A protein has these predicted regions:
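Short, low-complexity disordered leader/linker segments with a strong preference
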Residues: 1-50, 71, 435-448
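Long, aromatic- and glycine/proline-rich binding clefts that accommodate carbohydrate-like moieties
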Residues: 38, 142-146, 307-313, 360-413, ...
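Short, well-ordered beta-strand elements
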Residues: 45-56, 76-81, 106-107, 205, ...
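Short, polar/charged alpha-helical segment
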Residues: 57-77, 411, 430
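Extracytoplasmic "Venus flytrap"/periplasmic binding protein-like
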Residues: 68, 72-139, 146, 170-181, ...
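Hinge/lid segment of periplasmic solute-binding proteins
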Residues: 111-163, 187, 202-206, 217-222, ...
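A bilobed periplasmic-binding-protein/Venus flytrap-type ligand-binding module shared by bacterial periplasmic
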Residues: 166-169, 326-339, 418
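Glycine-centered hinge/linker elements that transmit conformational signals in sensory
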Residues: 190-192, 236-268, 310, 314
Length: 448
């Protein structure tokens, strides 16, 4: 019996070793070739750009946009990684990659509140030389300000968001009621119409919004507080108004008049998709969401209220003004990308007027570029953009600080507990949350 398992009959051990070494070299060359193919997309030699994005409401639109780009830029291949819909969960995914200086992220989307954090951490590439002031002026000023940190700009606006108010115009017409201007009018109108409709329609609620513990809750609650003359936090001055009477009373109103009253108790678990689904299924009279919800509300394949929906500014409290939280998404480049030139080529395309028009027409996303609000095709499909333009221009930002994730964590915990626990002392809880936020903001000032 052969003692050496690789012995070849009729040959000596020297020849056997030669065969083994040759075989191993061939295998190694094959592996090297395959690895090279992964890096350069096979023999085509394409530059691969890893694009990390959050889960959009209409994913097919982004696929179409990427396909157009790759057709017009055959030397570049886009590999898209789609994160979760929740901005909080997507933030966790993206920041973990950037902390690790991951090579599988070149271009990424940022929520409007992230640029200061990403800039301070050194994750986002400064774009001043690539995106100079003459180009910046083509975008809404609020979006440029949101992407600026210490005189450098770190993102290019993709689309703008602000909270808006949707209503069933057919039901308001039926009962000869106006669009509510105040939150109390909304609650009163909802109670009356739901009561009357219950005689024939037992599945109608008065209101639907986003009240789960996540970033969307902060957006919603800021709108109530601001529209009562209150404030959430001032990053520049390092103060929080959560403990002041206007803020406390606004939160109390939500707890006592919205949760489980005008809205079902289940809204405490709702993000945007769940709250919108209640509305488009014809089960909510009023609804707070972002501009994209208009397109879905009027899509016959997704909505039972097509042609029955109106849109307006959010209500406010008596004697105060309407406020809308600034939202929207930006496109940034990883400071660790090895293909920054190709990445910028993709960012330019993605934020162009041409692509923002596609996003407006096919996904209902409000453009960040000012000139598109005069586009006849967009206004024909979304006439309310003309009226809502002022809302987009004056939308109110959340506290602009690199430590915003810590601030948001305090806000989310406080708001969630405050609106879901009827027996807690709101004044005490609010004061405690305000003190926590001021300590966080003091840390930022101490680090400057």
């Amino acid at each position: 019996m052969n003692r050496f398992p690789f012995d070849v009959p009729g040959q000596g051990k020297k020849e056997n070793y030669t065969i083994i070494v040759t075989t191993l070299l061939c295998i190694a060359l094959m592996i090297a070739f395959l690895l090279a193919g992964c890096i350069k997309e096979g023999a085509s030699g394409k530059t691969v750009i890893h694009f990390v994005t959050w889960k959009p409401n209409i994913p097919g639109v982004m696929e179409e946009i990427i396909q157009i780009f790759e057709t017009e830029n055959p030397a570049i291949k886009i590999r898209r990684e789609t994160g979760p819909h929740s901005s909080t969960a997507f933030h966790d995914l993206l920041t973990q990659k950037l902390k690790n200086k991951s090579e599988d992220v070149d271009v990424f989307l940022m929520d409007v509140i992230w640029p200061p954090e990403f800039a301070a951490a050194g994750w986002a590439l400064p774009l001043n030389d690539l995106f100079p002031p003459p180009e910046q002026e083509k975008f809404m000023s609020s979006t440029i300000l949101a992407n600026t940190f210490k005189d450098n700009i770190y993102g290019v606006p993709l689309f703008i968001d602000s909270g808006v108010f949707y209503y069933r115009k057919d039901l308001l017409d039926k009962y000869q009621l106006p669009v509510p201007g105040t939150w109390q009018q909304m609650v009163d109108n909802a109670e009356w119409i739901v009561h009357e409709e219950s005689k024939t329609n037992g599945e109608l609620y008065g209101f639907s919004g986003q009240f789960k513990q996540y970033e969307g809750l902060v957006c919603n609650m800021q709108e109530y507080i601001l529209s009562n003359g209150g404030s959430v936090a001032d990053a520049e001055n390092g103060t929080s108004g959560l403990g002041d009477a206007p803020a406390v009373e606004a939160v109390r109103f939500v707890r006592e008049n919205i949760i489980g009253k005008a809205a079902p108790a289940g809204v405490l678990t709702y993000q945007e998709p769940e709250s919108l689904d209640l509305f488009v299924q014809g089960k909510a009279l009023f609804h707070r969401n972002w501009p994209y919800a208009w397109q879905i509300s009027n899509d016959p394949e997704k909505s039972k209220v097509v042609g029955k929906v109106g849109i307006a500014k959010l209500p406010h409290f008596k004697g105060q003004e309407s406020y809308s939280t600034l939202g929207g998404w930006q496109v940034g480049i990883s400071n660790y990308s090895k293909n920054k030139e190709a990445a910028w080529t993709f960012v330019q395309f993605l934020t162009s007027g041409r692509v923002q028009k596609i996003l407006a027409l096919k996904a209902g996303r409000a453009p960040a570029r000012k000139g598109l609000y005069e586009d006849a095709e967009i206004l024909a499909s979304y006439p309310h953009f003309r009226d809502m333009h002022e809302v987009f221009l004056t939308a109110y930002p959340r506290p602009g600080t690199p430590l915003y994730p810590a601030v948001s964590n305090v806000l989310q915990r406080y708001f969630s507990r405050a609106i879901s626990s009827p027996d807690i002392n709101l004044e005490k809880e609010a004061k405690g949350a305000a003190e926590e936020i001021e300590k966080i903001l003091a840390m930022e000032k101490g680090g400057k």
